[in-house]
Design a protein with these regions (language model features):
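Charge-dense, helix-prone N-terminal extensions
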Residues: 1-139
Length: 139
């Protein structure tokens, strides 16, 4: 789980702190949580409900272990191979938050350091997920 924290903490604007509910580490961007890692093998990530539904349908994540009807997802890290999946989900959450911040504030969160199109291409997101991003973008 240290690899997850060290990677996510390098993304522009991300702050890392203690997660109060259940222990672990929490990642925030502009004061809003983009996910947290529990001490065990569990990563929880908040999404807009539409994005969450796409991720569940694509079997990228599971419904949240405590709040299955919310926008949150859970992802279990059982081995080193699962770290990549956790990072993929956290990156999607980060990028979605950047897009919503840019739309709301009409500002470039992270400056030019975050190229949303290039990042989504690199993640190889599905058409459905890309459509969800496009719906909230500044046009």
């Amino acid at each position: 789980m240290n690899q997850i924290e060290s990677t996510v903490s390098e993304w522009p604007g991300v702050e890392v702190g203690s997660h109060d509910r259940g222990g672990g580490r929490e990642f925030t961007l502009d004061g809003r949580e983009i996910g947290h890692v529990h001490r065990g093998q569990l990563v929880d990530i908040p999404f807009a409900k539409r994005v969450r539904d796409i991720l569940i349908e694509e079997e990228r994540a599971e419904k949240h272990h405590v709040m299955p009807d919310s926008g949150w997802v859970s992802y279990r890290v059982r081995s080193d191979e699962d770290i990549e999946g956790a990072l993929w989900l956290l990156r999607v959450a980060y990028l979605y938050r950047v897009v919503t911040l840019r739309k709301r504030e009409e500002t470039q969160v992270g400056g030019d350091a975050v190229d949303i199109d290039a990042a989504l291409d690199e993640l190889n997101v599905s058409d459905a997920l890309e459509d969800a991003f496009n719906e909230v973008r500044v046009v």
